[in-house]
């Protein structure tokens, strides 16, 4: 990481200068102007966080923090400790922590919609960016700001409408997000020549705009490809998840809205080394705008080894249901699991690159299902697989983690409420993941993170190096 800089008061004032969009929003909002905005709070915390990094590097900058084996080099850099990611840390035994807080703690502490039980993703965005749990008022304000920024440019609507209906929804989402580069305040400011200390303020503006517009873009893709209907207007007094659910056509189903709040919250962030998070960071390190950076991350998320896993789980469960019918006995499930493994296939939704216990994101979804759809046949099947699969996988002996991950459950929940188009599920994931990766992109620009540039060698060079060791 490049040396970080101290931001003076003038730079901070410049970074939080209101754009015309913000000015209009501030004038229109009906809540107290005394409430500190997210941008103001981040700016206030920034000097202390910069000093923390400077002190860490000054005292420990020359220390060796990891050892790398050749297997790791050839194994996808698995487990190499070389990235800075402030929002979350993944522990193999207890799962993800968002700014030090577990998923159950986030479910308890983060503000909720009136009458709701699940946390609002707006609150998690605030937590990821600042490290602080926001107040209910701060979350309401953030909901209102995202709603105020949600209008999608006409040329983006026309671009989506002209896509072939059989073009994969993720390709359409990436296309639309890339095209939003045309609206980038960061790109315009950079082209004019701005001080590096101002980068983060423009990155923040683009990030807020992108997050605000994603549900409407995603819903337009859904309506065009699957429903042929119109996208409902954003209701300015409603939260982010309600508006997304309503634009998808599920706004009247309170349980689905609650599910979407949970889904968007728990899929946001999972450390910085996964493909979508790392790609966003990598592209952003070249000073590409948040639009181009997130579009690149979405392309990574679209890969079958990353964001398509819940589709594979759902397909596998559907195949199992056809074979075993209503027989959910231990014997029937065990036989099907062994048939899958003996055929050289994996059990989708089980195992994880880091985790060695049940994914707490799975547990959160299971708890939701137990409360809202305990009699659903597919949930009952998922529950039986959860009961039996770890034992079978352990006996099989070829996995380090025989427990379910987040993908083992989400498809069944979405199917229950009528969102049955499995090849759209990654779009939901993408909307959520943007909320998780953009806080780090803002932080990167605020602390002066450099362009990423690791060293590479050919196999012949590695042979030469290893012979000398």
Swiss-Prot record:
Q: Where is the active site?
A: 352
Q: Which GO terms describe its molecular function?
A: citrate (Si)-synthase activity
What does the record give as its pathway? Carbohydrate metabolism; tricarboxylic acid cycle; isocitrate from oxaloacetate: step 1/2
Q: Give the UniProt keywords, A-Z.
A: Mitochondrion, Transferase, Transit peptide, Tricarboxylic acid cycle
Task: Kindly give the Pfam families that the UniProt entry links to this protein.
Answer: Citrate_synt
NCBIfam families reported for this sequence: cit_synth_euk, PRK09569.1
In Swiss-Prot or TrEMBL terms, this protein is called Citrate synthase, mitochondrial
Q: Which species is this UniProt entry from?
A: Neurospora crassa (strain ATCC 24698 / 74-OR23-1A / CBS 708.71 / DSM 1257 / FGSC 987)
